[in-house]
Structures are given as C-alpha cells and as structure tokens.
Amino acid sequence: MAIDVGSKSVGIALTDPMKMTARPLTTLTRAGLKEDAESICGLLDEHRVERLIVGEPRFLSGQESPVMSVIRPLVEEIRRRRSVEIHWQDERLSSKEAEKKMAELKVPPEQRRKKRDEFAAALILQWHLEEQSEEQY
C-alpha cells in the first residue's frame, strides 16, 4: 500500500497480489494526526498490508519539502500502532503525472481534483514496484 500525504487529504493506493501493478484505492480527508493514523491503520489491517510506501515530497532541486513536517509525525504514529515495514519513495512530479493519467483514462475534470492524491499514490507505488523489480535482476 502507498500513501500520498497532502495538507488536506491522503491518497491511498494498493498493489495486486503479484505486486506488479498499482491501482488507486481512495482519498481520505485529513482529520488530525490520530484520526488519520487510525484510518490508515484500518486500511492496513483490512488489506493485510505488510509494507507501506510513503511518498516523500521533494523539490526538483532534491531539497525536502516543508510538507515532511506533517508526514513524519503521521508515519511515526502509524509505526507506533502497527509493525508495518515503511519505505520512503521520491514523489517528485507525481501530481503532474497523476493529472496526465486521469486525462488518459478520461476521468471527468470535475472528479480529478478529488482523485488526484489517490492517483499520485498509485504512481508512487508503481515507481516503488518498478525499482524493486530492477533490484532483483
């Protein structure tokens, strides 16, 4: 499972059982640290997730985004509640790529804003899966 944490929402994506492709699952509206962690942990349990991929926002220069000050405490709260393996994944340009993907899939423009984070999470997860595949060969 992958999460794309923003200031107002958290995009969630899952992989198929073979861990080859990622798909958007849902977008959670941010409600506070403990509430967000509880919602994400519920999804971890529901989908029997062993590894959580967390989008790591960086500027094109490579410098860390200030949003990390919100993401780190959330990840620590999840880690405190569940013994899930955490992996960080560079998410540069994921939102722009998500917009392109939604346009390709003909997602209506009025729905794109609501679905952007979950599509970005799916891209983050797909990038992680591809990196893992490359490391195996």
Task: Please name every model-derived segment.
Residues 3, 8-137:
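Phosphate- and other anionic-substrate recognition elements at nucleic-acid/protein interfaces
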